[in-house]
Amino acid sequence: MKLSKKSIQKAKIELVDFSNCELSTKSYEESSMKKNAIIFKDEKYLLKYMEKNKARHYQDIKNQKETYFNSVYSEYISCHIGKMIGLDIQDTIIGFEKENNKLKRIQYIPCVACKDFCKSGENIVNFERIFEIVNRKENQKYNDENFNDVLKVIEKQEFIDKNNLKENFLNMFVFDSFIGNFDRNLKNFGIIENEKDKTYRIAPIFDCASSLHPKANRKRIKFLANSYERDSQSVYEYALSPNSYFKDDNGTKINYFDFLVNNSFNYNSDIAKSIVKIVPKLIELNNNGGIYDIVDKLDGMIIPERIEVIIKELNLKVDEMFIPTLEISKELLNKEIDEFMLKDYSGFNEYNKEEKSEFLSQIKNILEIQELLVENNSNNFSTRELYRRVDNFLENKNTKDMKAVFVYLEKNDFPIDYIEHFEEKFRLEIEKSTKNKEKSNNSKEINEDEEIGKEKKFDINF
């Protein structure tokens, strides 16, 4: 749908005119959209817009009539949905640029401005580069299109805490399955490097333009809108057809619906955690009209049928894909806790350093799972019951020094609710100890008690 001065004036949101923005010297990766580095309100932005010639250049190989002309809107809608469910995702602004055509008439070119999330002295390191580094170090050749190989490289890399990076990647994967992103290649996610002190952080999610069927032309969209009216089977097939960029171990592209529902995501508890974390927020946003509000604001920029198709498709995905996979995930995570409650840890002191570290990571993971389940009213075990089990383990490791345990929990980022629980136990223990001291007339005994916490350490021997 062509923009005009009239449609811009009637738009439901303010469309920013980027025509006279100062250009920045920052350079970005080439993609299917024309890009310009600009300065807007003293901030760096990447301006992405689809020129007609550019759109033709990136035509679909199988269907020469399909282009990525609607990627501007896909980027804006997807990023705003991600922002509303609390994901760390790039900020975007929708707008236009003016230019004169051959007849010297003003054309209004739709564009989306993506805020640069790198601070001064920082640089984006995409995952393609991380793959190269790990391959060279390990003398391996991990497949950059294989989903499981990506997870292996996440485990092997040493820039970011592997658990945090894995969680971020899987959260992004679940989100991509909702927006139907078919091009989350290794250049489209990564980490940020501070070039001065060589510290690293995970980059926000960016480049969501290959989502929400950006290649579907007006004719296709109108056909789908009519199909929704008729409740046609073709609607279900089209809505659930998007594949991930990544492939399974057989070299087949992962279909999001098959992977999450039919194959139950291979009962991977890490994926289940991301599902329980992301999906309830998507369901709530869909049910309270939040998605409709985001898409409807583009009325006048995109045809009404496209608005209708996007809203109905995402609603269908909630019902057909996400509600079923959420139930599978809850069941799997409750089973994880059930197995932990029955676990025998009597041989912990005979574990080697790696085994001890792994078991304590399991405890942390179980506590995180419980938090997620409680948030969604889906926990089979009470939190008090689980905490009692964890307490029994932590307090029986050849030490009575709760202070040392407390320091360990904080240092290793255990869930805050459990840390506060343990801190309260620590406080009550101090009160009890103080009362006992007051009753005692043995000053030597008092002095010995006061040294507790200063000399003993949590007996894990890392």
Tell what function each PLM region has.
Residues K2-A11:
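Juxta-kinase regulatory segment immediately upstream of eukaryotic protein kinase catalytic domains
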Residues K10-V134:
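Conserved ATP-binding subdomain of kinase catalytic cores across diverse folds
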Residues E75, F147-N217:
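Conserved kinase catalytic-core segment
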Residues K83, E195-G347:
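C-terminal catalytic region of ATP-dependent kinase domains
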Residues L333-I337, F359-N365, S382-L386, L394-M402:
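Short amphipathic alpha-helical heptad-repeat segments
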Residues Y345-K353, V374-T383, L394-D401, D413-Y418:
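Charged, low-complexity interaction regions
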Residues E355-Q370, V407-S433:
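Repeat-associated, polar segments at repeat-unit boundaries in modular proteins
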Residues I430-F462:
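Non-Sec secretion/translocation targeting segments of pathogen effectors
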